[in-house]
Structures are given as structure tokens and as C-alpha cells.
């Protein structure tokens, strides 16, 4: 499913090349960049010592954070908001990054059961871990 008015926002893309964008150009540009993230773990795939048990691809936190910023800065406020809320809030996805080991979650959203802040063991070596994405 691709969001109306876009060619890149959704599962896969409908573009006839990387330069083609839908009518919601700014939102679609954000989705295209996100789709081209170089650091990802395919559905049911493994990388960096992590296994993605989800039925969809998960990306590095760097790519997800850039996607979130891009959507927030988009002039296409309605379409960007819809895409952002769907990806970041409804899907309840996770991203991965290299960081100090998580000791515990400091703040957890009671409604969506999503971790917001973490305590880290800063004396241990960094390792790749899953992190909940922020709500949109």
C-alpha cells in the first residue's frame, strides 16, 4: 500500500526511477530518502548481532530520526503528518543503533507501552540494540 499522492510512502514504491515523486513532493522526498537508508535489517533478517522478528524492514535510528525531522519540516503538513503518525505512532516500530548497553527504561509511555528514556551502562562496551521510535 502506497499513501495517496506519493510514490515512495508505504510498502515499496511506485516510481519509475529515483527522480520521480508524487504530488506531495516534500513528503515523498522524505520517504524516498528513508527508503534508501543504507543501514537496515530486512524482515526476519539479521545484522549487527540483532534479528528483526518483524514482518517489515527496520532501519538504523539515524535514518528514522532523519525521516522524522524531514516530515516535520515538510511543507506538505497534512500528508507528512499522516505518514509520520502512521509510521512512528501506529506501527510502533523500533530502530537500532550502536550504544552503551541499556540497563533500564527510565520513562515508559503508559498508553502505547513505548520506552522514551533509557539508563545506560556507560562503562561497558557499546553494542547494537533495539530502541523504540518516538511518537510523531
Swiss-Prot record:
Pfam families: Phospholip_A2_2 (PF05826). One of its GO terms (biological process) is lipid catabolic process. It catalyses: a 1,2-diacyl-sn-glycero-3-phosphocholine + H2O = a 1-acyl-sn-glycero-3-phosphocholine + a fatty acid + H(+). Ca(2+) binds at residues 8, 10, 12, 35. PLA2 catalyzes the calcium-dependent hydrolysis of the 2-acyl groups in 3-sn-phosphoglycerides. GO terms for cellular component: extracellular region. GO terms for molecular function: metal ion binding; phospholipase A2 activity. Its cofactor is Ca(2+). Binds 1 Ca(2+) ion. It comes from Bombus terrestris. It is found in: Secreted. Its EC number is 3.1.1.4. This is Phospholipase A2. SUPFAM superfamilies: Phospholipase A2, PLA2. Belongs to the phospholipase A2 family. Disulfide bonds join 9-31, 30-70, 37-63, 61-95, 105-117. PROSITE patterns: PA2_HIS. Its main location: secreted. Keywords: Allergen, Calcium, Disulfide bond, Glycoprotein, Hydrolase, Lipid degradation, Lipid metabolism, Metal-binding, Secreted. The active site is at 34, 64. Glycans are attached at residue 16. InterPro entries: PLipase_A2_dom, PLipase_A2_dom_sf, PLipase_A2_His_AS. Expressed by the venom gland.
Amino acid at each position: 500500500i502506497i499513501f495517496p499522492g506519493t510514490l515512495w510512502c508505504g510498502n515499496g514504491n511506485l516510481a519509475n526511477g529515483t527522480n520521480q515523486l508524487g504530488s506531495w513532493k516534500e513528503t515523498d522526498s522524505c520517504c524516498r530518502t528513508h527508503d534508501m537508508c543504507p543501514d537496515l535489517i530486512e524482515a526476519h533478517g539479521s545484522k549487527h548481532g540483532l534479528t528483526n522478528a518483524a514482518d517489515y524492514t527496520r532501519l538504523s535510528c539515524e535514518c528514522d530520526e532523519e525521516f522524522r525531522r524531514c516530515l516535520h519540516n515538510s511543507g506538505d503538513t497534512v500528508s507528512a503528518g499522516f505518514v509520520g503518525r502512521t509510521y512512528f505512532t501506529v506501527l510502533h516500530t523500533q530502530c537500532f543503533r550502536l550504544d552503551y548497553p541499556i540497563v533500564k527504561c527510565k520513562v515508559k509511555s503508559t498508553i502505547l507501552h513505548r520506552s522514551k528514556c533509557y539508563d545506560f551502562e556507560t562503562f561497558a562496551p557499546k553494542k547494537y540494540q533495539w530502541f523504540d521510535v518516538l511518537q510523531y
